[in-house]
UniProtKB/Swiss-Prot annotation:
<comment type="function">
    <text>Anthrone oxygenase; part of the ergochrome gene cluster responsible for the typical purple-black color of the ergot sclerotia. The ergochrome gene cluster produces several ergot pigments including the yellow ergochrome secalonic acid and its derivatives, as well as the red anthraquinones endocrocin and clavorubin. The pathway begins with the synthesis of atrochrysone thioester by the polyketide synthase (PKS) CPUR_05437. The atrochrysone carboxyl ACP thioesterase CPUR_05436 then breaks the thioester bond and releases the atrochrysone carboxylic acid from CPUR_05437.</text>
</comment>
<keyword id="KW-1133">Transmembrane helix</keyword>
<keyword id="KW-0560">Oxidoreductase</keyword>
<feature type="transmembrane region" description="Helical">
    <location>
        <begin position="140"/>
        <end position="160"/>
    </location>
</feature>
<comment type="similarity">
    <text>Belongs to the anthrone oxygenase family.</text>
</comment>
<dbReference type="GO" id="GO:0016020">
    <property type="term" value="C:membrane"/>
</dbReference>
<dbReference type="Pfam" id="PF08592">
    <property type="entry name" value="Anthrone_oxy"/>
</dbReference>
<feature type="transmembrane region" description="Helical">
    <location>
        <begin position="13"/>
        <end position="33"/>
    </location>
</feature>
<dbReference type="GO" id="GO:0004497">
    <property type="term" value="F:monooxygenase activity"/>
</dbReference>
<feature type="transmembrane region" description="Helical">
    <location>
        <begin position="56"/>
        <end position="76"/>
    </location>
</feature>
<protein>
    <recommendedName>
        <fullName>Anthrone oxygenase CPUR_05435</fullName>
        <ecNumber>1.10.3.-</ecNumber>
    </recommendedName>
</protein>
<keyword id="KW-0812">Transmembrane</keyword>
<feature type="transmembrane region" description="Helical">
    <location>
        <begin position="88"/>
        <end position="108"/>
    </location>
</feature>
<dbReference type="InterPro" id="IPR013901">
    <property type="entry name" value="Anthrone_oxy"/>
</dbReference>
<keyword id="KW-0503">Monooxygenase</keyword>
<keyword id="KW-0472">Membrane</keyword>
Amino acid sequence: MLRGFAPTGVHVVALASGVFLSGAMFSVSAIMIPTLLDTNKEPAGLTTQWARLYHYGSVLMPSMSVAIAAVYGFASTQYRQSPQGMRCLAAGALTLAIAPYTWLAMIPTNNALFAMAASAPGFAGMQDANEKARDLVMKWVVLHSIRSILPLAGAIMGFTGISSGQEGVVGSAN
């Protein structure tokens, strides 16, 4: 424990949740997608399962990022106009950044995979389609792995905000 630093429950929730979100997101790239690649030899199965995985992730992960950013925002209110409070706000912004990153960096790949999933039954047995599907999924893995780092970066930023001292903390003896 850092000398003079006693995190509140809200700090612990923000940090743990940010790290959890990052790990949950990265596990999709590190565990789930390799499983899909190993068990699907046709583009129809691969792209259809990717689309379902994406659907469930798109429901859960952005909602979690909004909730975590709100907790960081609340944590920032425990500091007066100080660098610690600004770091907590930056942590929330980094956590929320998964949405604009998706829009700016991933939409073309996502759309190509969705289009392939919609027409995948017509690709059965076509080697070119199989390679294209696998290449698109692997590109998505790289992009998603980068996106997965954002909540972790937020947690690191949040940790620096809450661990850099108690000066400015509302209710502290300073």
